[in-house]
Amino acid sequence: MHSVLIGSGATNMVTKNGKAGFDLEYNLILTSVPRRLDRSPGEIKDIIRKTLEELIQDKYSDEQGCASSITYRLHSLNGKRAEFCFDISIIRKHFQVRNKCRLVWNEEQGGLVWEQIPASSKQDSKVAAIKRTGHWEKVRRRYLDRKNRRLLSQDYSQPSYAIYNETVNHVFQSIKGL
């Protein structure tokens, strides 16, 4: 297994808004899964969570609210605000499909499932077109504005990668006709 910094950290758009904290997102990529755990995604997440808790001990609070990713927050000394948080999404190459899959909560099934990740090459080509035409600063400004507003209001309902993807798509559509 290995981890990859994604989202704002990977694109140099880490958010820090006033006294609000900042966050980073990682993909934890599983290169193999023991056969006995192959069809137990919830157990895989529990094992990873327990391992992380042993490593970070009591330095971070475990946010149980997100069913898909694992989130930890480091609070200020007075405990009133988050200074830093990190989200970990669990990714693996699934045995039945060629693409990678992300561990997500499925409401209908009432549990965690492996969901195939759509090919990211389309998004990569949009980013390249935006940069090539000199509009990357629009992405930065719009993303940082949206993300900072969410941090200030402590709205963690939309993952940063979703905000980033929406922002890229919005800017790409706005320059497409130019």
Enumerate the language-model features and the residues they cover.
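Conserved catalytic core of two-metal-ion nucleotidyltransferases
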Residues: G42-Q96
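Active-site nucleotide-donor binding segment shared across nucleotidyl transfer reactions
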Residues: M1-L24, L28-R35
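The feature captures the alpha-helical scaffold/lid subdomain characteristic of nucleotidyltransferase
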Residues: M1, K59-D62, F84-C85, S89-L178
